[in-house]
């Protein structure tokens, strides 16, 4: 089971995005007073009392509207509700109970999901009595907050985590390697997965996942066990852009969140899109293992350097993940399809790699001897020792005299030395510099 998912639901303009930003800890959504406003990201990670969970801002639900954009937003909100473990139903304590609130409540009750009723915009203690009319929704005891002033959020979050699925934190990590296939619609994700499954003999099962997870395929090959996560269910069913475009990646984000390895599938004829970069950039931010598969390579007219030229263009577009390997395939003809899982396994192995402290310090000592740190602010960085503190992605802590004397170019040099000494193909590595007195 992945992290719990909490959907923030309510009619327009009740303060959902303001609350979303408070819980996410940073401003990552544009907040305006116009119903249906476009927002940049609706999916973020949050934490409360050692409970890590995912929050989704569903946008405003207007049950009776015939507007095509609003109707599409309503359908996407319903999808988020299906995915959610807990629903936060936000209402406006200043405006009071409205017929639209009753319509939303009716829809939420049908979901049979745990619902926490939150009365927002209670900015002063004398406004607390405004919550009582919301008992008429039949959802239970309301919790009052002021999202803009961050009042009452602790009590609200206590109620949220109380409703998380029992035992989700107790499950041991299983031995499956989870691989998410992401990319634009019609790029060939399903075809590639079907080809991989068709070429392997030891398929355990091929079952429909929950509404949250699209379709998971379970595969055993030799000593390895894989879960192939297909996000092919993502289809933008409308040509309408702006407001609804942001919803097209919700399930992809959920798949990335569960994955160890993320495969970005690119159509060789169409190239990479801004949406591709946003999606794989999110996986990079979460420190997932990454690789790029260029599909439909059979359709490209080729010269001697076509592949290298194409790869260089992609690497330029995806410069933030220079560590990712590339493979050019045709899911239709089967060209190089058999190598996709091999490369994903290699990325996962490097993603999970642990280096002994002794070997690590030998490499860094030699690196410092070859090139001393530059003098910064009249002082020179001195590295006492380094140790690896985590895997998935490999994380290294350098104990130094003064982290402020670290120049960004020397940090890049140290990372390059680690990559030259150890194979970290397919995975980012994290480096932290902490002060330690000599």
UniProtKB/Swiss-Prot annotation:
Q: Name one Pfam family in it.
A: MMR_HSR1
In what residue span(s) does the KH-like domain sit?
A: 353-437
Residues that, per the record, bind GTP 1: 10-17, 57-61, 120-123
Instruction: Please name the CDD domains in this protein's record.
Output: EngA1, EngA2
In its keyword annotation, does this UniProt entry include Cytoplasm?
no
Gene3D superfamilies recorded for this chain?
3.30.300.20, P-loop containing nucleotide triphosphate hydrolases
GO MF terms held by the record: ATP hydrolysis activity; GTP binding; ribosome binding
Q: Which SUPFAM superfamilies match?
A: P-loop containing nucleoside triphosphate hydrolases
Q: What processes does the entry annotate via GO biological process terms?
A: ribosome biogenesis
Task: Please indicate which superkingdom the organism of origin belongs to.
Answer: Bacteria
Q: Which InterPro entries match?
A: AAA+_ATPase, G_ENGA, GTP-bd, GTPase_Der, KH_dom-like, KH_dom-like_a/b, P-loop_NTPase, Small_GTP-bd
Detail which positions bind GTP 2. 183-190, 230-234, 295-298
Give the transmembrane region(s): none
Q: Which residues form the EngA-type G domain?
A: 4-168, 177-352
Q: Which UniProt keywords apply?
A: GTP-binding, Nucleotide-binding, Repeat, Ribosome biogenesis
Matching NCBIfam families: GTPase_EngA, small_GTP
Described purpose of this protein according to its UniProt entry:
GTPase that plays an essential role in the late steps of ribosome biogenesis.
UniProt similarity note:
Belongs to the TRAFAC class TrmE-Era-EngA-EngB-Septin-like GTPase superfamily. EngA (Der) GTPase family.
What assembly does the database describe for this protein?
Associates with the 50S ribosomal subunit.
Q: What is this protein called?
A: GTPase Der
């Amino acid at each position: 089971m992945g992290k719990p998912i909490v959907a923030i639901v309510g009619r327009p303009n009740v303060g959902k995005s303001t609350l979303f930003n408070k819980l996410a800890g940073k401003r990552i959504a544009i907040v305006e007073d116009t119903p249906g406003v476009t927002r940049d990201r609706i999916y973020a990670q949050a934490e409360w009392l050692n409970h890590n969970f995912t929050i989704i801002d569903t946008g405003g639900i207007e049950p009776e509207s015939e507007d095509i954009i609003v109707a599409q937003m309503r359908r996407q909100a319903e999808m988020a509700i299906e995915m959610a473990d807990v629903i936060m139903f936000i209402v406006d304590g200043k405006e009071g109970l409205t017929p639209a609130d009753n319509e939303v409540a009716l829809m939420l009750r049908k979901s049979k999901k745990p619902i926490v009723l939150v009365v927002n915009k209670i900015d002063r203690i004398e406004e607390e009595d405004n919550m009582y009319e919301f008992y008429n929704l039949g959802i239970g005891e309301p919790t009052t907050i002021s999202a803009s002033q961050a009042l009452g959020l602790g009590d609200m979050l206590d109620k949220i985590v109380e409703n998380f699925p029992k035992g989700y934190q107790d499950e041991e990590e299983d031995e499956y390697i989870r691989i998410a296939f992401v990319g634009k619609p019609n790029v060939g994700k399903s075809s590639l997965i079907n080809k991989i499954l068709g070429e392997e003999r030891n398929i355990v099962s091929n079952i429909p996942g929950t509404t949250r997870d699209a379709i998971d395929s379970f595969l055993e090959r030799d000593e390895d066990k894989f879960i192939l996560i297909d996000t092919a269910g993502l289809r933008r069913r409308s040509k309408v852009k702006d407001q609804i475009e942001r919803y097209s990646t919700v399930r992809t984000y959920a798949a990335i969140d569960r994955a160890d390895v993320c495969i970005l599938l690119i159509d060789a004829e169409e190239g990479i899109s801004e949406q591709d970069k946003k999606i794989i950039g999110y996986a990079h931010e979460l420190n997932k293992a990454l690789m790029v598969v260029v599909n439909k390579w059979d359709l490209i007219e080729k010269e001697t350097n076509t592949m290298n030229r194409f790869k260089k263009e992609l690497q330029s577009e995806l410069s933030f993940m220079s560590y990712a390997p590339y493979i050019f395939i045709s899911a239709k003809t089967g060209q190089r399809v058999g190598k996709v899982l091999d490369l994903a396994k290699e990325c996962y192995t490097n993603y999970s790699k642990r280096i002994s402290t002794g070997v690590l310090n030998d490499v860094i000592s030699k690196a410092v001897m070859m090139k001393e740190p530059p003098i910064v602010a009249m002082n020179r960085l001195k590295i006492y020792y380094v140790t690896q503190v985590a895997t998935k992605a490999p994380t290294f802590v350098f104990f130094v005299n003064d982290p402020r004397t670290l120049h960004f170019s020397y940090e890049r040099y140290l990372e390059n030395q680690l990559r030259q000494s150890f194979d970290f193909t397919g995975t980012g590595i994290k480096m932290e510099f902490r002060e330690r007195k000599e």
